[in-house]
Structure formats: C-alpha cells, structure tokens
Amino acid sequence: MQKIMTFLMFPSGLEEAVKRYVSTFEKYGSRIVSTGKGPDGKVNSAEFVLAGQTFLSFEGGPHFSFSDGISLFIRCETQEEVDELWTRLSADGGKELDCGWVQDKWGVRWQVVPKILNELLSSPDRERAGRAVQAMLKMKKLDIAGLKKAADGN
C-alpha cells in the first residue's frame, strides 16, 4: 500500500476532473477506485490511480484553489507523449504556461517534461546545460528536438 498519497481539494468539478484524468492516463493503468456522494447526490470525494500513483480528492467549495506552489510532474519518454498529454491537459479552458507547465481547467498545475531534459540540464558541460535552460525558458510546450539543438549549440 502506498504510504504517502497526493490529496487534491477541488473548488468544483471533481467528478469531471477525475474522469478526465483517468481517461488521459488510461494507457498507463489508471482507474477510479471509489467515489462518495454528498447529500445532493453529487460526487464529492474520490480515490483514483494515475499511472500507479494513488490520489485522494474532495470537492471543497469555492474557498479552495490550486496554486503554483505544487504541481504534478509527468516524465515523458517521447515527443509524441509530450504532445498528447499537453493537448489533453490544456483542453477545454486549460492554460499553456511557460517551461513545460500547463494548468488544466480546474486549476491543477502539471509539468509535462521529456525525460531527456534532466540529462541536458545535468550535463557536466555547464555551457551545454545553460543553452538547454535558455531554450527551455523560451518554450511553453517543451520540444525535444529544439532542446537538443540548443544544447548542442545549433
């Protein structure tokens, strides 16, 4: 059993958000574990799994909101994976942010990051790493080819 779990308190839209997340990450073994309903019959709590990570969530009302202080980090293997997840998470009113960040329509912040970025940023060649950082700072959705090209000085 997972000892530490992420808990998300949604201001509204919990049921729709959970369904969207499970659908977005379906091919990674995602599912809804359980839901609870309030007196009004609406789903107000949920436990769900995204790519092996268990989340707990409540719909707490308008005095709750998400912030840049925490984000969900997705390590992507390919550009196709970056593109697909970026598109799904930014859909229907989401916002494309800088440096690989996207805010979904419920306000949750996600970092959609290609695995190679860590390799580029931790390069022992600090100039190469610096060029990768400068390229990343100019991007919204991260582009693997663009990051590599910049790191290589092209």
Where are the predicted features?
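Short, solvent-exposed beta-strand edge segments and adjacent coil->beta transition regions
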Residues: 1-5, 67-71
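Core segments of cupin and vicinal oxygen chelate
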Residues: 8-52
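Vicinal oxygen chelate
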Residues: 14, 24, 50, 65, ...
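Short glycine/serine/proline-enriched coil/turn segments at secondary-structure junctions
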Residues: 40, 63-65
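Conserved, structured core segments of small domains
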Residues: 56-61
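Conserved "turn/edge" positions that cap or connect secondary-structure elements
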Residues: 116-118, 126-129
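Acidic/histidine-enriched, glycine/proline-rich intrinsically disordered or flexible terminal extensions
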Residues: 129-154
